């Protein structure tokens, strides 16, 4: 069978399963759940590896000066948090169970090899990830659960007198379609 053998209204391009090029400097670590009949346990931070199993987490945080840890909850339907970026700080995001979110990243660094690239990450809902977002990468998220919790580390203490937070419109042409939830 060929595309021409399909009724014209249903002739569309084949779904593209290619993975986009990730934004330079964004790091993602899948966390391990230790599950038994009582529930589960999961490490989300480790400053050093005391055993082989702790090496990936300790390596992920190597060189990270965690200055502040924050917790945020969105309990509004159909809401988008973002976009914003920082000049001085990196963020490390974690959506704790049962929260789930669609993270949108947009590289706006002038000299980055991935300048202008976008990346989408779905985190939470059983896909336990840490996502490290470097300074200069605009970021935001769309909750996929209500409520949706975000636990995150930052590398600079927040100063209300001199906030290191700059806005990019959530519906900027480079990202406006990335917030959608695809059907089909």
Each model region followed by its residue ranges:
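Non-catalytic, conserved peripheral segments adjacent to functional cores
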Residues: 1-126, 146-184
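Conserved metal-binding segment of the jelly-roll/cupin
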Residues: 123-145
